Structure formats: structure tokens, C-alpha cells
Amino acid sequence: MVAPAHIAIGKLALEQTSLKNDLDIYKRVYMFGCIAPDINFIYPFHNIKCTPKRFIKRLERMKKIKSKLIRSFTLGVIMHYLCDYFCLAHNNQSYGAKHTLYERLMNHKLKLQELEPDDSLQLVKSFWAEAVESYENGGTDDIDKFLEAREDKSIEIFELVSYMNNKYLTYVKDKAGKNWCTSKEQMYIDLSWSLFMCERVGELITA
């Protein structure tokens, strides 16, 4: 995703959850973290197959580090990765013109305020409930109980994200045709999934 999309989703995730109060973060530093991985060109391609260690390391940093400055930045970086994990351009190995076109059009539509999360949100919620239940949490979608039984919270969060990424790819497989890079529907889907996952993972980090 382009920087404006990362910033917009990061801001919404912050406003629509208790992240800001629970973590006592610096908003400007957090927002910089939301775009930082795209500034450092040494980083690998931002899909879930290329960055599992980096993602888990940042989850662990949120648990161990007490510095408000570092935690604010790290949370933003986590949100950046989540946005890219649920963006088709980062999942279909599209490195060239189509990737660039998709991001440019998304940026344009965001500026015109033509993009809002679509009705796939209910489907995302049902997949999330399945994801939590699939990890043998007694058939409940109570995420706090799920995490209490886990020793390595960072690994478990990553596995939930990975599960959801697989569901996302299955969902968009039949929808994304040759013209996916200009599809407004695909942009709606990506924004819906990205925002939902940023909110849920943010809640898990503070659990």
C-alpha cells in the first residue's frame, strides 16, 4: 500500500480501539512507524512469507520494551506489515507496473475520499471467530482466554494472522481477475481486511 493508505488505516485503528490509552503512545512517532518500512529499501518484500521473523520480533519488542518512544514506533511498523499482508499487490508477487498502478489508483481514490471499507467486513469477522476457535480455545471466541493458555503470545498472534491471510487469499482468488489492479472492489476488500486486522492485533498486543 502507499503511504496515505498506511497512515489512514493506522489512524483509524488508533481511533477506533483503546490502543492510544492502553499503550500511552506518541501519535506522531506511531504514524511514522506506519510508513517506515517503505522508507528502508533494505527490507524484504512485505508479504507474510518474507517477513515472519521481523513481524514476530516486533511483537516481542512490544512485550519487552518499556520505552514509550520505541513502543510507539514499533506498533506503527506492525500496523504497516498487517496492511501489506492483506493487500493483494503484496500477495500475488506483483512487483512491476500493476503493483504501481494499483497503489497509485488507491492513493488517488483515498484523496478523493472515494474508498470506504465494504460489506466484506462481516465475512472477515466470521473468519476471525473461526481462527480463534481453531486453536482449541474451548469453542469460544474469547480472545483473552485463548491467550492466557499460551506461553508465547507473539507466536500465537502471528499464527492467527497467518490463518487470516490464508482466508483472505482464498476469498480474493475468485474475485481478482486480470484487471485487479484497477478494481475498486479489490481496494474496498483490502481496506476492510487491513483495518480489521490492525484493530484486532492491536487489541491482542494490549491483552
Sequence positions of predicted segments:
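N-terminal leader/auxiliary helical segments
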Residues: M1-V77, L82-A207
